[in-house]
Amino acid sequence: SNAFLEKFLAIGNFSMAVSSYFIGFTIDRYNKKKLMLFFSSICAICIFGEVVISNEIVMYVVSVIYGIGAAGLITIVPPILMTYKTEENRNFIVYNRAINIISLTIGALLAGLLTGKQFSISIKNVLLIVPILYIVSIIVFTLHDNIASKSREKSKERNFYLKKLVSERYWILIIVAFLCLGFAPLLVNFINVYFYNRYNIDVSNIAYMYALINFCSGITIFFVSKMEFKSIKCIMSMVVLIILDNIILVVWNNLYIQVCCVFAYICLFELLTSYVYDIVLSKTNSNFHGRISGVIQASCNLSETLGIYIGGVMLGLKCYWLFFGVSIISTVVSIISIIILMKEKDD
C-alpha cells in the first residue's frame, strides 16, 4: 500500500541520515576496502530480503539495515576515490557522479522495459538482478588491490588537524553548506511532477523525456569532469548560472526552453555539489576524510528529505516563483559558507 511504502522509504532515509555520521568515524578507523565489501554485502542481502519477505514489521527492519548499508557505500566512496587522486586524475568524485547518473538512468529504463507488456516480468524477479549486480561489484572490487588504507599517524601534525577539524566553526560551516546544498536542487526530485503540473504532458512521455535529460546530463558531466573548476571564481560562475537558470524556469514558459533549462539545472547542481565535496576533502587531512564524508552525507540526506516535503507542497500549489526562489537562496547561502571555509583552510 502507499502508506506502507511511505513509511518504508521514510525509515530507510532516516536510517541513512543518522548512520552516515557514525559510519564516517568507522571509515577512518578501519580498512576501507573491507568496509566497502561489508556494506556491499549488506545491501545485496537486504535487497534479496525485500524480494522474499512479506511481513511488514520485518520489512521495516530490513529498511533500517539497508539504510545503514547504503549510507556506508555512499559515505565511503569519496574517501576511497581520494586515495586514487593524482595531478592527472583530479576529479574522480565528479567522474563517479557522472557514471552514477548514467547507470541509474539505464537501470530505470531496463526495469521499466522488463516489467512492461513486452516481457511482463514481475517486479520482484527484476529486483533479484540487483543483488547479483552487488555480488559482481564485490568480486571486481576484491580483485583490485590498489586501495591504500591510510595509517593514522600519532603526530603533532595529526593533533593539529584534529583540533582544527573538530572546532565548532569548521563543523558549522560544513553542516550549513551541505544542508543548503542538499536542499537547493528541489526540482531534481520533482521533474516528472513539474512537467505534468505545468504542461499537462502525458506521463509516459515525461518518463522518456526525463530519462533522456538524465542520460545527457550524465554524459555532459562525464566530459566536464576532465576539466578543473575548483577556484572560487569558477564556483561563483556556476552559482550565477544556477541563479539565471532558476529565473528562466520561472518566467519562460516555452517547453523546449524549459527542457534545456532542466538539463542545465541537473548538470550545474551535480557539478557544483561534486566539486565542493572534492574541495572540502582536498583541503583536509586524509585521516579524517571518513568523518567529514559522514557529516556531509548526513547533512545532504536530511535536507534532501526536507526538500521533498516542502517542494511537494509548493509544486502542489503551483508556486513556481517561490519554489525556484527558495532554490536560489539555499544555493547562495551554501556557497557563502564554502567560500568562508576555503579561506579559513587556506589561512
Tell me what each language-model feature is.
Residues 20-31, 115, 220-232, 315:
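Helix-to-loop junctions at the C-terminal end of transmembrane segments
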